[in-house]
Amino acid sequence: MSNTSNSFFDGDFVSSNQQVFLPILEEKKVELFIKREDLIHPFVSGNKFRKLKYNLHEAKKLKKKSLLTFGGAYSNHILATAVAGKLEGFKTFGIIRGEELGKNITKTLEENATLREAHEHGMKFHFVSRELYRQKSSFGFIEKMKNKWGDFYLIPEGGTNFLAVDGCQEILTKEDSEFDFI
């Protein structure tokens, strides 16, 4: 893990509101704005950025050196965790639903841009059957992963936990209070 206290997540990430102009909106006298959370980072943006922010802060606080999370073969959460983990100096491990994908990893990475990008950012994969994937939160499964990869900070599937909620609360700011509907 990096020895510096600087963090990818430490900046002031207030996303802009971009107005959408369409004839139908003008005709109906409606103003429509889109919150541009997608502009934060090419791979770690929007709710993925917000969900990971405090989880990675907590992992650092606990002095963890690696992260483990779960997802499907096309999971944006898997990719965001790999990229954010690399930026923050963590090793990353992904439990991927679909054991057939692990039978020919070269072919899988050629055909699956999401897993390829996560792999290129250093994530190591463990492919499991859908049945075993349903047991991913069990004590026995987690212990097997600790035996395989050592101690890690566990991020739930999709990054969803109370720390993720704290991060997502930062999406709306006082500048957004002027809107009637969100």
Where are these regions (language model features)?
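PLP-dependent amino-acid enzyme catalytic core
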Residues: 1-182
